Amino acid sequence: MRAWIIWSTGLLAYIVAVLDRTTLGVSGLDAADRFSAGPSVLSTFVVLQVVVYAGAQVPAGLLLDRYGSRVLIVTGAALMAAGQVTLALTDSLPLALGARAIVGLGDAVTFISVLRLVPHWFPPRRVPLLTQLTGICGQFGQVLSAIPFLAILASAGWATAYVSVTAFGALAMVLAFALVRDTPRGRVRATETLTVRGTLASVKTVWLRPGTRLGFFTHMGTQFSVTVFALMWGVPYLTVAQGLSTHAAGALLTVSVVAAISAGVVLGILTGRLPHRRSWFVLIIIASNVLIWTVVLALPDRAPLWLLVVLVVVISVGGPGSMVGFDFARTFNPSATLGTAQGMVNMGGFLAALLVMQSMGAILDARGGYSFDAFRVAWTVQYVVWAVAVTGILITRGKARRQMRAEQERSLLETFEAS
């Protein structure tokens, strides 16, 4: 029971992180009025969030290995609360951007810290499913931003809505401080201070493990498409290029969340029971993404609604698919450097998403703005990422398997010699 209480408390902190991550997205029009910002400036908030989140992953992983989950979850909640209360009270655009960066920093340390709790508190056979459930349940934060937060925003205004979110974050911080413990044996104690050279050597060692890179390319190839779709270009594509109403586009994003939840449960069970087939599951998910996008983009005109539904469902499976990358990191890294490895894995999809978002924006501008033909060309940027990711998976998978066999043979030899 204690393990479930600790995981649930960490999960609440992650739900708040997703809530904080998505509040600005649902309040975009209000933000435009409050900060006198046009569409390009508003998109800066999204890009800034991704840049800070991705850039902070390796430092967050190093801090996680040094100080443990409890310290980082509490710190992350405090940073996000500080950023949200600043957004609540300011009408200065530069200050709002700075506050958004602080929110992104707090968000960056939270997810991997909650994931780190799972292998410490649960038996190995449950870890894959609980890893999936962590990612899945965290998406309830998006529901909170879309329903109660938006309702408060509409009825009570900007400041009240953002202060309410700040209060929720403060609650998560207090509960994490009171209830979360790093391991059953007590808290993680800080190791000796590392020099800059020592830190870089540690990062290099973790990255050179084939399992870490396998997780990185897994996260890259599965997660970026749905992230780009949900965070920036999905709604404009559905409404302008495909001719759907805003209501219909919102309904498809709801379908995306349901599809991700359903796929996550199934994938968690499968990866737990068939751990040696994890990379095949990942390759199938990437192949399905490539196939459905090829079908949609090959059409000379707008796609029928049923095909767009299939598109959204298929790319949404990439969200839980990316969680397999963290399972690779856990399998091929010792506990002492697991945080660093998970941070590296988490960079993969977000770096790819950032590059695709920026590249698509440049292509859309070059082709005269939002149109069916412009989007049709812009979405093809994804194929470059898929090619890189699949190549990386195939190469690192072979190296990881050889490393595992060598370690098993070494273990057997040591056992034989000891007997």
Predicted regions, residues:
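Cytoplasmic membrane-interface "Motif A"-like loop-to-helix N-cap segments
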Residues: R66-G76, G272-A287
